[in-house]
Structure formats: C-alpha cells, structure tokens
UniProtKB/Swiss-Prot annotation:
An example molecular function term from Gene Ontology annotations: heme binding
Alphabetical UniProt keywords: Heme, Iron, Membrane, Metal-binding, Monooxygenase, Oxidoreductase, Transmembrane, Transmembrane helix
Entry keyword annotation includes Coiled coil: no
Recorded family membership: Belongs to the cytochrome P450 family.
Top enzyme class: oxidoreductase
Entry protein name: Cytochrome P450 71A8
EC number from the UniProt entry: 1.14.-.-
Pfam families hit by this protein: p450 (PF00067)
Organism: Mentha piperita
Coiled coil: none
Topological category with respect to the lipid bilayer: Single-pass membrane protein
Co-factor requirement: heme
One annotated Gene Ontology cellular component of this protein: membrane
Gene: CYP71A8
Length: 502
C-alpha cells in the first residue's frame, strides 16, 4: 500500500520536474533569442571589429606576413574578407585589399602617418612628416616648384641624353644584356642629375660610395624592425645590428646631402644644369615661395625624390619588359604603334608619346599587374571611423594592399592575365581618383610626383620598342617570375634579353 502510494508520489514529482525543466529550457531559449536580437540591434555592436586571423602569443600575425606580405595578406583576405584586423606584436593594423567605397573628401581628418618608427631616422622626416600647415606648404613647394608639368618638361634633355646612352650600350652589346642593371643605372642617373645636378657612376670614388649608400638606404626602407611591433623586444635590433645600420646610413646620407647643399651655397654659379637642390636653395635663401624652409627640410625632400624615383621607376621598366618578352604578340602590337607614329625619325618627341595610346595602356597594365610598391605607406586613424561596416578605432594603423586591389576580381575581368587592351576604352587612370588602380596612392597623401617618373617610363619604353627587336636568351625559354622582397618588388633573377638593332 505504502509502496504504491510512494510510487505515485515519485511519478507525480517526476512529471512536475519534467515540466519544470521543459519550462526552464523554454524560458532560457526565449531569453537567449531575445538577448541575441538585442545585441545584434545594439548600436554598440552594429559596427563590430573586422575579422582576425588566428595569431601567436606576443608575435601575433607577424610570421604569417612572410617575406612577401602582399601575397600572404591576399591569401588571408580570401578567408577572412577584404578587410581584416591583424595583430603584429603590440600593433593592431587594419588591412584592406579592396578599393574603398565612396569619396575621400574627409581623409585628411581621418588618417595621418604613423609616428615612432625606428626606420623614420632614415627618411630624416621627423620634423616634417606629420600632416599640418608646414607639411602642406612643403607639399605645395614640391608640386609647384619641382614636380609641375612645366618643371618636368624642363628636364627633358636629361631624359633624352640618358636614354640615348642606354640605347648605345644595348646597341654595342653583342649578346645578352642585363636589363635589370641597365634600368637601375638609367633611373639613378636621371634622378641624380635632376635632383642634385650631377650623376654618380662607376669609376668615380665618391659616386660609387653614394650609390652604395643609396642601395643600402633603399634596402633598409623595406626591412621590418621587430622593435616597431614588439617594443619589449627592442634589444633584438641591437643584437642583429639593425639599429647600427640605420644610424650609420642615416648619418652617411645626411653628410652626403649636407655636402651637396654646402657646395651649392658656396659656389652657386658652378651649377651645370637646373636641379631640385638649386631650386630649393633659392627658396631657402630668398623665401621666394612665401614659406621658410630649413636645410633639414631640403634634405628630406631630396631624399624623398631618391626613395620614390629610383628603385620604383626601374622596377616598372623591368616588369614591363618582362611581360612583353612573355607575350610577344603584345610586344609586336606595341612596336607597330611606336614605329608607325615615329615613322623615319630617329628621335621620339613628347608629341609622339601622346599619340601612343597602346604604350600608355601597357604602362597602366604593368602597374596594375606588378604594383611597384604593393603595400602603400601605412596611415593611422585620427579618430573613430567606420570602414565597410566595421569599427576602426582611433590609433589603428591602416594598411592598403594596392597590389591586391589591382587584382581584385570584383573590379577587373580576368585580373590574373596581363592584358593592356582593358585600358584602351577605359577612363581608369592611376592618378589617385580611380580607387581600383592606386600604384601611387590616393587622396591628399598620394604621390604628388607621378608626372616625373611617367615621363621617364614612357620615353624609355618607346625607345626600346622603336630601336630594337627583342627576344629571350636561347638558353632561357621561360622566365622565372619570382619576386624579391623590398619596398619596391623586383625580380629575384635579373632580366636578361637580346636586343637586335632595327
């Protein structure tokens, strides 16, 4: 009797507990759905942080960047999306591989250059690098006094003479020519003559020393300083000699530029041809541009010219010829245009260049396919902003993968093919207004001197196509396209070719 009653009580309790648990589960589910919905509608969470790849302790994603960060960042973006939050030691940059949406009228108030980089000593720009009134005045001087179309045209004789020397060297060669080396020498000579009034070549002790300093300077600009990302590991830069190299090259470059300025000030009548240093010293002495500049500012501007105008120009020529040798049908089409425009004339003029539409398409396609500086100069958010639906808090470093943007399938048809024809009926240009093609950057921080390198690039390539037929060496039927890390991405193996005089 008691056992039956006890069993009935247990069964009733079991039913109550079951109903209670079911009720609790139902309430919990309703609460979970409500909380999730509330969180998704919460203003705080509407704009979340960008997705992040998995990271290591302390180092974060540093090792994942590898020696060619533009490739690895694009691979990560394929998994995590076009905008990512990285963890590079203590630095948390946002990386983007897709062209930005909308206009950038307010970019000045949103972004600035990062401060505190150890390699900043190389650029001698600590006093003038920040965005402010003085920086704007210096940029105005560069645009108006140094890099205007009129000024670029004034250096036409320099381009013509140095290009003629290059054509002679190629013509005098009986076999393979090292185009990589020749393009580097050409651009160094053009930039040196334009910037400081003379060139520094082999056989000149001072010239060889300067070229050595310049090579190491450009190499260090592309190096990664572990102390910039993990401040607690600053001592590694001391042990591996990085800090020592930075200080030595900064000192040697400063001494060289100071010597150039001193010679010009002591003997201004000795200048052989117009150059940037003399123009800047005229402003320095007479305040002729309405702004006061000091010697450090002159050095910083000239150093910027060397950094932006030597390696990058040579790299674009190197990759342009690489692709033309890989695609003989494109080369024949370009040669046909150049020779048809020039006809029987020996010298190519600027008017001729303006008529060479396929030449300009080849240059654009080269800079899309082989963006010379694949990762643009990083910027830092000056305030909280929203980018593509994600929150980017103040102080975040922003990295733009211009190389990946140039190969974005949402912007380009067959982006992995070298096809200059895509630009023949297109208004897309590289001057910073079309965000799917930004080899020189965009907005107020874009490179103001695009006219200067383009004049050299187009003139040189047109002459190479007019005066020679080109083929690969007989022992090299297929080109190795491997890239060498650095600020400007060069070929690992120098480009060799055979040029036959026309």
């Amino acid at each position: 009797m008691y056992s039956i009653a006890f069993m009935l009580v247990l069964r009733k309790m079991d039913e109550i507990i079951s109903h209670t648990l079911a009720f609790q589960a139902l309430v919990s589910l309703i609460l979970l759905i409500s909380i999730t919905k509330w969180l998704s509608n919460s203003p705080k969470n509407k704009n979340s942080s960008p997705p992040s790849p998995r990271k290591l302790p302390i180092l974060g994603n540093l090792l994942q960047l590898g020696s060619l960060p533009h490739h690895n960042l694009r691979s990560m973006a394929r998994k995590h999306g076009p905008i990512m939050l990285l963890h590079l030691g203590s630095v948390r940059p946002v990386s983007s591989r897709r062209r930005p949406r909308g206009n950038h009228e307010n970019s000045r108030s949103r972004l600035r250059r990062p401060r505190g980089s150890r390699s900043a000593a190389l650029q001698l720009q600590g006093r003038v690098g920040g965005y402010g009134e003085y920086w704007r005045q210096l940029k105005t001087i560069c645009v108006v006094q140094l890099l205007s179309n009129k000024r670029v045209q004034s250096f036409r004789s320099v381009r013509e003479e140095e290009t003629e020397l290059l054509m002679k060297k190629i013509g005098d060669s009986s076999g393979n020519v090292n185009l990589s080396h020749m393009f580097t020498q050409l651009t160094n000579d053009v930039v040196c003559r334009s910037a400081i009034g003379r060139k520094y070549g082999a056989g000149d002790e001072n010239g060889e020393k300067f070229l050595e300093i310049l090579r190491e300077f450009l190499e260090l600009l592309g190096a990664i300083s572990i102390g910039d990302f993990v401040p607690s590991l600053w001592w590694i830069n001391r042990i591996n000699g990085f800090d020592r190299r930075v200080d030595r090259i900064a000192k040697e470059m400063d001494e060289f530029l100071e010597k150039v300025i001193h010679e010009r000030l002591e003997n201004p009548a000795a200048k052989a041809e117009e150059n940037f240093v003399d123009i800047l010293l005229e402003i320095y002495r007479n305040n002729s541009a309405g702004v006061s500049i000091d010697r450090d500012s002159i050095k910083a501007i000239i150093l910027d010219v060397f950094a932006a105008g030597t390696d990058t120009t040579a790299v674009v020529l190197e990759w342009a010829m690489t692709e033309l040798l890989r695609h003989p049908e494109i080369m024949k089409k370009l040669q046909s245009e150049v020779r048809q425009v020039v006809k029987d004339k020996h010298n190519i003029t600027d008017d001729d260049i303006e008529k060479m539409h396929y030449l300009k398409a080849v240059m654009k396609e080269t800079m899309r396919f082989h963006t010379p500086i694949p990762l643009l100069v990083p910027r830092v958010a000056r305030n909280d902003v929203e980018v593509m639906g994600y929150d980017v808090p103040v102080g975040t470093m922003v990295m733009i993968n211009a190389w990946a943007i140039g190969r974005d399938p949402t912007s380009w048809d067959e982006p992995e093919k070298f096809r200059p024809e895509r630009f023949l009926n297109s208004s897309v240009d590289f001057k910073g207004l079309d965000f799917e093609l930004i080899p020189f950057g965009a907005g107020r921080r874009g490179c103001p001197g695009t006219t200067f390198p383009m004049a050299t690039l187009e003139f040189t390539l047109a002459n190479l196509m007019q005066k020679f037929d080109w083929e690969l060496p007989h022992e090299c039927r297929e080109l190795d396209m491997s890239e060498r890390p650095g600020v400007a991405i060069r070929r690992v193996i120098p480009l060799l070719a055979i040029g036959t005089k026309m």
